[in-house]
Amino acid sequence: MNLEKEIKQKAFRSEQSKLIVNLIYTYNQLKSRIATVLKKEGVTMQQYNVLRIVNGAAKEGITTSEIRERMLDKMSDASRMVDRLESMELLFKQRDRDDRRVLHIYLTDKGQSLVKRLMEQETIDQLASGVNEESAQQLNELLDAFRASL
C-alpha cells in the first residue's frame, strides 16, 4: 500500500515533502514493532542500543564516552543508562589497570544471554525481508546521502 492510502492523504506538495512524511511514518512503524519485542524482555530501545554497543566491544570493554559516541539516539544519557543496566545486572564496570580514572563497561553473563536472545528473535532482518539485497543497498546509499545533506 502506498503512503497516501495508508495515511489517507490525497497528494503531497512535492516528492521531497512526501519523502519526509514517508521516513517519519516508516520509522514509527519500525520503532513500534521493535519496541514490542524489547518490552517483553524488560528493556527500552535505548537500553538495547547500549547493550548492543557493549556487546560489540566484547572482551576489550568500552567506556561511557565511547558508548555515547556510538549511540543511535544522541540525546540519550549514556551514564544514566549504564547505571540502570548495571542495577539490572546486565552490565558491570571495571577500573582500568593503568588509569584508575577510566571505567570499562562489560556485559554480565545475564546481559550476554539477553543480547543473544534478542539477536535471535530480533525482527529487524525479518522486517526488511521484503527488500532484496540490491534494493537494501540502494536504499542505504540514498539514506546516507540524505543524512549527509542535513
Report residues per predicted region:
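N-terminal leader segment of winged-helix/HTH proteins
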Residues: 1-41, 90
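Pre-recognition alpha-helix immediately N-terminal to the DNA-recognition helix
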Residues: 18, 22, 49-53, 113
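N-terminal helix-turn-helix DNA-binding core of bacterial DNA-binding proteins
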Residues: 28, 32-74
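C-terminal regulatory/oligomerization modules of transcriptional regulators
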Residues: 1-11, 134-150
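Charged, amphipathic alpha-helical coiled-coil/dimerization segments
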Residues: 83-138
